[in-house]
C-alpha cells in the first residue's frame, strides 16, 4: 500500500512511558498513518551503556497502541541517525513527516543534513 503522508517517530523507547505515548499521539495528528521506528539493542548499548527491554519486547508493546499503524527497526548507522527509517518510509509514502521529541532539536538532528532539501520530507519538533 502507498500513502499520501506518513508520520515517523523514532527512538529507543526503553522503557516505554506516558511521555512517549503523548509523543506518538501528537505525531499522528500530522498524518493518517503513524510509523514508529525503534532503535536496536546495540544502539541503546552505545547510547546508554545497556538496555532494559529487548527490541522485540518494545515492539510488541508499541504495536498494540491504538494510534500506531506500523513498527519498524531503525537501521543503525555511524551517526546514530534515523536516516534509514526515513528511507523506509519514503518507499511507502509521497511525504514523510519526521517528528522529533525528547533530546532532539534543530541543532542536533543529523537527519536534517541529508533530507532538508528533499521536498518529500518535512520536520516537526516538539
Spans of model-derived segments:
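Nucleotidyltransferase catalytic core that binds NTPs
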Residues: 1-126
Amino acid at each position: 500500500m502507498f500513502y499520501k503522508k506518513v508520520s515517523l517517530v523514532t527512538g529507543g523507547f526503553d522503557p516505554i512511558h506516558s511521555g512517549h505515548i503523548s509523543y506518538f499521539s501528537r505525531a499522528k495528528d500530522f498524518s493518517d498513518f503513524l510509523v514508529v521506528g525503534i532503535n536496536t539493542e546495540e544502539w541503546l548499548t552505545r547510547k546508554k551503556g545497556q538496555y532494559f527491554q529487548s527490541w522485540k519486547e518494545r515492539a510488541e508493546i508499541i504495536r498494540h497502541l491504538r494510534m500506531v499503524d506500523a513498527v519498524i527497526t531503525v537501521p543503525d548507522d555511524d551517526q546514530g541517525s534515523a536516516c534509514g527509517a526515513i528511507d523506509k518510509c519514503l518507499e511507502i509514502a509521497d511525504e514523510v513527516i519526521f517528528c522529533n521529541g525528547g533530546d532532539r532539536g534543530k541543532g542536533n538532528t543529523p537527519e536534517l543534513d541529508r533530507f532538508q532539501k528533499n521536498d518529500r520530507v518535512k520536520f516537526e519538533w516538539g
